[in-house]
Amino acid sequence: MGNWLVNHWLSVLFLVSWLGLNIFLFVYVFLNYEKSDKYYYTREILGTALALARASALCLNFNSMVILIPVCRNLLSFLRGTCSFCNHTLRKPLDHNLTFHKLVAYMICIFTAIHIIAHLFNFERYSRSQQAMDGSLASVLSSLFHPEKEDSWLNPIQSPNVTVMYAAFTSIAGLTGVVATVALVLMVTSAMEFIRRNYFELFWYTHHLFIIYIICLGIHGLGGIVRGQTEESMSESHPRNCSYSFHEWDKYERSCRSPHFVGQPPESWKWILAPIAFYIFERILRFYRSRQKVVITKVVMHPCKVLELQMRKRGFTMGIGQYIFVNCPSISFLEWHPFTLTSAPEEEFFSIHIRAAGDWTENLIRTFEQQHSPMPRIEVDGPFGTVSEDVFQYEVAVLVGAGIGVTPFASFLKSIWYKFQRAHNKLKTQKIYFYWICRETGAFAWFNNLLNSLEQEMDELGKPDFLNYRLFLTGWDSNIAGHAALNFDRATDVLTGLKQKTSFGRPMWDNEFSRIATAHPKSVVGVFLCGPPTLAKSLRKCCRRYSSLDPRKVQFYFNKETF
């Protein structure tokens, strides 16, 4: 735990600050509405539910302002580039942007639930006080009406015949609240891991309901349902002095005047205006870049239905491990899908590898398999930075890819090859451990040439130990295993043709980390993963377990690719 805090102290500080701000805003507004004389009469009808509704509303505004920032990809790429020479701990929060985005969304859900429940109680109490015939203060307040000031009422339910449901669904606040809540529920449920992985199109389209959510939030307070006593009225008849003699209001010259009330002006738009403006600028920038012409220079179909596209685009510059968003208008005009760049910055083109994993990718692969002329138009937005850009910042790098998750490391390994070709000897990275876990033997095919070239290059430069790679096959059968066993004495692997033999099963991570820690007792080791959450959990545990509490000894820093 201590080592984890050392590695993530800035992320923890940021998270604690955000939680602290939520708690402060909630408590501050709650106490204000619970104690303020301005809402003395409002509390007579609504009780504590008033303060709960208003406190949760402010926290909703705050988090609705914050939630757009983590998905402004250009801003994050700019900050990552600005912090490229900073300590990796300072860049760590940028790598958790989507995690923070989800946490803010969960917080919005919590405060939405509090806000809805509180206002359901409020409408019920408004209705009861309007129907009450007992002459209580609440019933008197509900019947107040000033002809000279038609909007100086306290109870939004003006008639005892109006039901709670009718009042809730016909008011601006009630109607916009229902629409915003439905949009929020659809966005949150469609963002679940299972749906996002298997039905990305559903997630993509549904998530754009945030536009409706933001619009409803902006106009939610226009009705001014929550009302407080006016300053002028309080100066004439202070509630703490006059509430006990409410039966005598306006009867005598010296008696208290009946109070006047005013609704609160809408405030939500003030919170969301700046991030909305920033997000609109972000979208305009994305649109401008996506409209620039992309030339497809080469199309390669690899085994296991993996499509490689090599492209060029004017003014396109990339770094290792970055990703782009791709759109094919002939398939879907609105859908944009993220793909990691597999080319190196030193190459004259940029490339991506696409595996069939859903309707959109299957349609794209099918389109290119048909080899129509001319080729379908491709639009590209990016590139955007990720945690994989930091690979060269570590003395020792451990790269772990699962299936198509190897793509970020293809860019890195290609760049290494080019750097050694050009006698680039200023690399901070002195050792690379590369692990690739695949279900099918065909998946290794498109990566073999690169690994083979790296093997030869390292041998020629006298650095055969610079790259240590292990390939693991998890989808093998008895025929494959028997064939490999019969040819075990061959100089090259029977499945891949590489010097390193393919292993069957999954890596024993404790053994691997123990070996690396022993080989590099005083090094800073960066562990990079592009793979499933279960594998991330195992690697994260190993990083904590094998990192020394002594900062002068081996330290493992876990980094997971997310986009």
Swiss-Prot record:
Q: Per the UniProt record, which EC number(s) apply here?
A: 1.6.3.-
Briefly describe activity regulation: The oxidase activity is potentiated by NOXA1 and NOXO1.
Q: Which residues lie on this side of the membrane: Cytoplasmic?
A: 1-8, 70-102, 189-206, 417-563
Residue ranges annotated as coiled coil are none
Q: Where in the cell is it found?
A: Cell projection, Invadopodium membrane; Cell membrane
Annotated residues that bind heme are located at: H101, H115, H208, H220
Mind telling me which GO cellular component terms the entry cites?
Answer: anchoring junction; cell projection; cytoplasm; early endosome; endosome; NADPH oxidase complex; plasma membrane
Q: Any one Gene Ontology biological process term?
A: oxygen metabolic process
Q: Where in this chain does the record put each Ferric oxidoreductase domain? A: 54-282
Kindly give the membrane topology term recorded for this protein.
Multi-pass membrane protein
Parts of the chain that traverse the membrane: 9-31, 45-69, 103-123, 168-188, 207-227, 396-416
Q: Which PROSITE patterns match?
A: FAD_FR
Changing T429A has the effect of: Loss of catalytic activity
Q: Which residues carry this modification: Phosphothreonine?
A: T429
- Extracellular face: residue ranges? 32-44, 124-167, 228-395
Sites where a glycan is attached: N161, N241
- Cite the entry's keywords alphabetically: Cell junction, Cell membrane, Cell projection, Electron transport, FAD, Flavoprotein, Glycoprotein, Heme, Iron, Membrane, Metal-binding, NADP, Oxidoreductase, Phosphoprotein, Transmembrane, Transmembrane helix, Transport
Its domain of life?
A: Eukaryota
Tissue pattern of expression reads: Expressed in vascular smooth muscle cells.
Positions contributing to FAD binding: H337, P338, F339, T340, L341, T342, S343
Describe the task this protein carries out.
Answer: NADPH oxidase that catalyzes the generation of superoxide from molecular oxygen utilizing NADPH as an electron donor.
Could you tell me what this protein is called? NADPH oxidase 1
According to its UniProt entry, this protein's organism is: Rattus norvegicus
